[in-house]
Amino acid sequence: MELDWRSTLSNQERSKYITELAQILADISQINGGARANFDLEKLKKTAEQFETSLYASSSSKELYLDAMRKRIAAMDAAKKKTLANQKQKAAAQRKGFGLAPTLNPQMFLNQQAQARQQARPMRGSVGGGQSPVMMMPQHGVPAHVAHGVPPGVAVSQAKRAQLSLQQQQQINEMKVAEIPRELLQRIPNIPPGVTTWQQVTELAQQKRLTQSDLQIAKQVYQMHQQMMVKSKMQQASLNQLTPQQRAQLQQRQQSTQQSQSAPPQAPQVAQSQQVPAQKPQQQQQQQQQQQQQQQQQQQQQQQQQQQQQQQQQQQQQQQQQQQQQQQQQQQQQQQQQQQQQQQQQQQQQQQQQQHAAAQAQLQHPNAYQQKNMMAQQSAAALQQGQQQPRQMGPQQAREVPNVLNKLNQVFSPAEQKALYENGKKLVQDLQLAGKLPASLTQQQQILYIKKYINQMVLKKLQQNIRLAQQIGAANSANTQSQMAAQAGARFTPGMAQHSQFAQQQHTGNQAQVQSQVSQSISQQQAQLTQKVQQAQQSQLQQTQEQDPQHTQLADSFSQRQFTSPTLAKPSANVSTIAQQQTQPTALSQSHPQQQQGSQAQQQLLQQQQGSQAQQQLLQQQQQQPPPPPPQPQQQTQQPQQPQQQQQPQPQPQLQQQQQLGLQPHQPQLAQAQAQQPQPQQQTQQQTQQQQQQQQQQQQQQTQQQTQHQPQPQLKPQSQQPQPVPQQVQSQQPQQVQSQQQPQPQQLSQPAQQQSQQQQQQQQQSQQQKLRQVQLPQQTPKITLPRPTEQDMMILKRINSEVAKSPLRLSNITNQLTPEQKQMIKNKLQANQQLLSNVDNFIPTLYLITRNEENVRQLLQIRMLAKEIMEHASKGVFIVPPDVVDKVIFRYQKYYEFIKEQLLRRHQQLFSTRQQQMQQQVVQQQQAGQIKLGQNAVGAPQNPQVTTNTDIAMQQQRVQGSFQQMQQQIRQQQVKQAQLQQAQQQAQQQQQAQQLQQGHMPVQQSMPLAGVQTVMATQAATLPQHASPVSSNTANIPKTGDAPVSIDSVTPVPPGIVNSSGPSPVAGKQILAATMVPQHKLSPTKSDFAQAPTADNPYQVDELRLKNLAIRKAEIMSRFKHRQEIFEHSPVDLFLCTLADCMGIKDGSYELLAPIPALMVEQINGTGKKKFTKAQQRVREQDSIECYVKDNKLMMSSKFSADERSYSIHDRDISSCFLDLYGLSDCTSLSFDSSSAEPPTEQVNKKRSHDSLEISPAESDSSLLNDSKKLKVDSPDDLFMTSNMMLDNKNAQPPIGLGLGVGLGEAGSSIWNWNYWESL
């Protein structure tokens, strides 16, 4: 959704907003700076652009982006207007203070006179010729304005003085001649005595008697003096506006204050004729001081008045807020009172109904009434304990918000938790932009605010769950009340008085009534507890809102925020699942072991709900297995069974399936509930169990006595029938069961019908017991996934190799992390160690479920990253921050949850099909049994028990026989598949042998075909009958996170084997090698070579041999490539070095003909100034050999073998390359020793012997030479087989000698001429 709204916003609109913001910022800085405003428009644009990009990234929709941008522009515009208004007010005040009086006062006249004398002074000096050069030009160390006599820091240069206004010029002139106060003058260091004006200070600066630091201090003091002068002028202007009477009063006050206080001593004044006027009367100074004091007093009075007004306004605001709070509190109190009244009314109604029912029950069953009283007393005691706990909380703890973060995993799923975290993060950013939170927050502060937000969410979710529980409890209580009323009305009929002899037997039927009353009392307790919890939470929320304004801002903004995650809006409709989830341990409960006491009432409520559910289940289980009571009429026993059937809880199929799969620890729900019950409820359960056991014993004794006195059979009551375990069978045949359970009062007197009904009931019971025995072990069918085929295994190996080809390159950030972060990473890895280590087990499962290669590739990449993190962390090295570890664990959990969900769905499908089959079989068996029962009832009614027993045994045998037949069919199919696969393997082996014979295979082989066939035969014989041969390939799937071993085998395979489609392991490996050649790197890595399968593998020798051949081939190709690059301008060395490899000559035992360039040597050895790039370094690491140059010798060693590997081939193979060259057939006659060379004339008809040339190992296998023969050296291969042109050119002049300065171009042209080599 974010991409959609961002795509609708064009760049032109964004740039328009940026320019508007920048323009407003420029206007504000111009208003604040005035004519001397100095700002950079580009910087302002960058600032506006940064704000816009942050808003663009954090906004979740276009509306929010536009709204925030408009608000920001409006706020800045209002700020601009406000600053402009303030500037206008200040300008108006300054005009009033500096307004020129119509007549000049004596002080202004003196100032003008001093200014005129100062202007005439430099003119006299210039006319007399006495002007010193120091005065003519500014000093180097003194600023220009100081050199010209202007005070430092504030005055401008002479060029800008013409632009100043009249008021500013007058102010500057006054500052020149004004006397510096003693307090300010003392702050300037290095001032000699007698200096009292700024003119004298400037002269000192011109004479370089003041340092730069002294000048800086002088500038600051000058500014302070200037401010004092401005204030004094403002005070004088205010005095001028006063009436003469007010002036007289002020003078009297000043005189009185001067008399009471000693006047400070005046600083000595040194009058100079050039700067200060000759006469300064003291009266004027006194008047100025008086005026200044008056102005200060007026300012103080004005400030005090303003402060008083502000205080009054604040008090009014506080009073208004208090009134609003009081109103809100009153409203809340009224609402609480209304709720309490409603609750009291409901409780009164319930109490009346209970009293009425209790009175009726007491008349008939005093024992049951006593039990009820005991349970009610115990529940009341438990309720009092729950009420006392919140009262004992301190006042400080009651004000805190209850910490319910430990319930986070019980309320929200991991996806919802992630969405909550993201929403909280965005909310904090929005509040920062809105100015409700500080602009800069540390990570801990940000996490604290996010936790507060999540805590609010969990609290609201729990409140919703409590409300749902209240609604469900109210509905249940209403149903139980209606049932009790119906039962009471049906039970206390006039006709019931006739059956007083069965009063003791009716006691068992009243257990339903006791249960309903117990559940009613429990629901009442729950309702009261929930009300108290809500009241406590409301009071705590109010107190926290008064104390923590930021917390209330978070809560208010959350209530206004719309969440994008759809899962947060789903209310939990099942309260029982919440109770089950609370039993599971959570990570947050471990991180917050100290729970707040504010949530104790809520926990007690949840525990009591669990206890009530467990108690109901216990009573129902006891009712489902009652002792056989004495026979009695069916109408009496039918009524107490109805509430039992209605109160039976529906099972949860999903929870059962999860327990069957073993994905969650199998713990019975009853044991969990009993473990979490409070003590009062446990006591009540124990008492009820004891009483019920006593009643059962009494009833058994009564039944035995009655059966002895009453020999004739009677109809058993319906309450004896136990409920069948499989609910599907019960749902499939409701009509039959109901028809069998319906009473027939008209035919009760007939003994034959009674016997037939009794037989039917016994038969049903026995059938149900047998079905339980058959179905219980089969209710948990194993999840059978389709076996991975050979193609699937190849795909998985290919994906694994592709992922392994791109290794991770993470830097070491151990020094950048804090100890807390390091410990956090270790704790996370240790907590999720089982999840991280079990990834390999469900990678094939993920592919078989999804058939998506991209998902498997992503999971393998995550596995590689997790493995690197764990390996480095075990060594104390950290390569990723903690948030990356969180992301890896979250992705693992996401994949695991997806696989678990898919497996559950598959299990449900298998379970449903199995149930349908069983239901059909049961229905058929019941129909056949009913037909036989009818025949037996008509033909032989005297011995029904024997026939029913035989029928049951026959049915059981049939069921078992059907299961055995199914198992035999499955085994036969598996055996057939194994035989077919073995036949395919034998056919493939035969084809392979034929193709190997046709492909000119060499005679010598390291492992003959017969040996391969014997190994194949033994492996096929060892395979189990019920297993598929393809399962042997499953061992190649990586289980330890490493790359598979057999991926990099690159041996050449005949084309016939590639076309074969059998599941032979050898053929499969060769097919894999042939298909993976163009896709994999030619040089295997050390990890591929070092690792080998740990299990017993009959093909381990072949695999190692093939791997060794692949490495050898890669090294040969790498050596040739290096030589091709280094000997680019020396093909002679290229040919000779390659021939030396074929003959088994070591690298350092021969010398090159042409020297290797120095640049090339530095590049190969890595000693040059130019460093390797990342790509070059990666190529060097992936290379299979190590290459370096030493003493103009190219040395190349293998990375995979410590010893020097020999690349020699047989001499016959070398000589076969030169068969057509003058009839040579043996390579031993060649000599490459240039030291014993003879003149070419004597060497034409001679053949040299080389006895020590047999360097290649004699045990080398010629069948392995196909690889070296198929290597394409960049040379004209056709010239080996033809002898034309160059070979026939016998008149060619022999070269001088390659070791004595022969030209390389000439040698390259005649390299393939045999005469050329003979001339050496």
From Swiss-Prot:
Region (Disordered): 235-283, 372-398, 540-688, 702-791, 1233-1270
GO molecular function, one term: transcription coregulator activity
GO cellular component, one term: mediator complex
Localization in the cell: Nucleus
Keywords in alphabetical order: Activator, Nucleus, Transcription, Transcription regulation
Keyword Disulfide bond among record annotations: no
Bias type Low complexity, positions: 245-283, 375-398, 540-554, 588-624, 634-688, 702-780
Compositionally biased region (Polar residues): 235-244, 555-587
Keyword Transcription on entry: yes
Spans traversing the lipid bilayer: none
GO biological process, one term: regulation of transcription by RNA polymerase II
One Pfam family cited in the UniProt record for this chain: Med15_fungi
Function noted in UniProt: Component of the Mediator complex, a coactivator involved in regulated gene transcription of nearly all RNA polymerase II-dependent genes. Mediator functions as a bridge to convey information from gene-specific regulatory proteins to the basal RNA polymerase II transcription machinery. Mediator is recruited to promoters by direct interactions with regulatory proteins and serves as a scaffold for the assembly of a functional preinitiation complex with RNA polymerase II and the general transcription factors.
Subunit structure, as described in the record: Component of the Mediator complex.
Family from the record: Belongs to the Mediator complex subunit 15 family.
Name recorded for this polypeptide: Mediator of RNA polymerase II transcription subunit 15
Organism per entry: Eremothecium gossypii (strain ATCC 10895 / CBS 109.51 / FGSC 9923 / NRRL Y-1056) (Yeast)
Gene, per the UniProt record: GAL11
